[in-house]
UniProtKB/Swiss-Prot annotation:
Residues spanning the membrane: none
One of the GO BP terms on file: L-histidine catabolic process to glutamate and formate
Reaction equations catalysed: 4-imidazolone-5-propanoate + H2O = N-formimidoyl-L-glutamate
GN (gene name): hutI
Pathways involved: Amino-acid degradation; L-histidine degradation into L-glutamate; N-formimidoyl-L-glutamate from L-histidine: step 3/3
The name this protein goes by in its record: Imidazolonepropionase
UniProt-recorded Gene Ontology molecular function terms: imidazolonepropionase activity; iron ion binding; zinc ion binding
Job description of the protein: Catalyzes the hydrolytic cleavage of the carbon-nitrogen bond in imidazolone-5-propanoate to yield N-formimidoyl-L-glutamate. It is the third step in the universal histidine degradation pathway.
Length: 421
């Protein structure tokens, strides 16, 4: 087979044998590091991988050849938890945060999520589209090729649908692949204050059926947290969403452990997000149900909290984990997955191999794209992040700098030395 593109002489390729399930426990510690590696691409797919000189049959008169001495290649990075589409920003709350006002106290004062809800409701489709596109461009420049994007800053049907429509439009227009999550249960809107059940009934009866019918989202999510939605309320919504055919995610055990992990396990959610306050019993329940723990260390960093999710304990117990940005305008205003990956080492005490497995193959399972992306594997799409680094440890050791040299998306050179092509 003659390749369309042949990428050669990488210092290292980060490869693994996809076992057909999210990596857990000791599997998280393993990878195949190919020295002097090459990747052959045809029709947007990886058709060969190896070390040294490529087989002659891969090279034809039209094959594009590129050498990458001094560089490493990983699968395209996957950010599987973002709140991509929103209006406004919340830097006006930053001084309060520095003064020690808590996240929930800011929310109780009408700020936080509710502040962004007001800004998003007043924002046009074009405004939301352009703002979200800029974030996606930034992510792409940092090596991200697939992104999960939630609604949840409308809390009414008109605005929630506008957010989902923006995600759908960007999925068509932008190189990054987007996976849509419906999260109207992100907070209790002011017009339903004191009556969350009535709001959940509106979501179940009036919103979810349309989202499913128009294929606007693949996943449904809810914020199960003190002063937001209880475990029983979360179970009520997610069980109805599951009956309608949605895959499930849940924000759980972020600030307090109130039963969200139990709901995730009972309903076999694909992932439980945050988990800073998870208990040993909660970890055991998620392992037993096969729920992926999606950890968001940049949120803990941004909130200036001391308690990070117990990633080391999770892995050692046999749990599958991912890492994501939680990109949003309040609790985590960043879109930099490289920073998150570095926090995975510095604050969660994970190794570079564990982090790379978390943000590639496990993240692919978290967004149900494991058949297409998440590993440098023959037959998968050629989503490739190329780092200006001599080995896979270097991008973690040399922190706070964008080390992306190039990005390939479906076999096309999409980012080249700080420019989107």
């Amino acid at each position: 087979m003659v390749a369309d593109v042949l990428l050669t002489h990488f210092n290292q390729l980060f490869c693994l044998n996809d076992p057909g399930h999210p990596l857990t426990g000791q599997e998280m510690k393993k990878a195949t590091i190919v020295e002097d590696g090459y990747i052959a691409i045809k029709d947007g797919l990886i058709v060969a991988l190896g070390s040294g000189e490529p087989d002659a049959e891969l090279v034809g008169p039209q094959t594009i050849m590129r050498s990458y001495k001094g560089k490493i290649a990983t699968p395209g990075i996957i950010d599987c938890h973002t709140h991509l589409v929103y209006g406004g920003s919340r830097e006006h709350e930053f001084a309060k945060k520095l003064a020690g006002v808590s996240y929930l106290d800011i929310l109780a004062q009408g700020g936080g999520i509710l502040s962004t809800v007001r800004a998003t409701r007043s924002a046009s489709f074009d405004n939301l589209y352009q703002k979200s596109k800029r974030l996606l461009d930034y992510m792409l420049l940092h090596g991200v090729t697939t992104v999960e994007a939630k609604s949840g800053y409308g809390l009414d049907w008109e605005t929630e649908k506008r957010q989902l429509d923006v995600v759908a439009a960007l999925e068509k227009d932008h190189p990054i692949d987007l996976v849509s999550t419906f999260m109207a249960a992100h907070a209790i809107p002011e017009e339903y204050k004191g009556n969350p059940k009535a709001y959940l009934d509106v979501i179940i009866k009036d919103m979810l059926p349309v989202v499913k019918e128009e294929n606007l989202a693949e996943f449904c999510d809810i914020f199960c947290e003190k002063n937001v939605f209880t475990a029983d309320e979360s179970r009520y919504l997610l069980s109805k969403a599951k009956e309608m055919g949605f895959k499930l995610r849940i924000h759980a055990d972020e600030i307090a452990s109130i039963g969200g992990v139990d709901v995730a396990a009972e309903l076999s959610a694909v992932s439980a997000e945050h988990l800073m306050m998870i208990t040993d019993d909660g970890i055991a329940k998620l392992i037993g149900a096969g729920v992926i723990g999606n950890l968001l260390p940049a949120t803990t960093f941004s909130l200036m909290e001391d308690t990070y999710a117990p990633a080391r304990k999770m892995i050692d117990a046999g749990m599958a984990i991912t890492l994501s940005t939680d990109s949003n305008p309040g609790s985590c205003p960043t879109a930099n997955m490289q920073f998150v990956m570095q926090l995975g080492c510095f604050m969660l005490r994970l190794t570079p191999i564990e982090v790379l497995n978390a943000v590639t193959i496990n993240a692919a399972y978290s967004v149900n794209r494991q058949e297409r992306v998440g590993s440098l594997t023959v037959g998968k799409e050629a989503d490739i992040a190329i780092f200006d680094a001599p080995n896979i440890d270097y991008p973690f050791y040399f922190f706070a700098t964008n080390l992306i040299h190039q990005v390939y998306k479906k076999g096309q050179l999409t980012v080249d030395r700080g420019r989107i092509l």
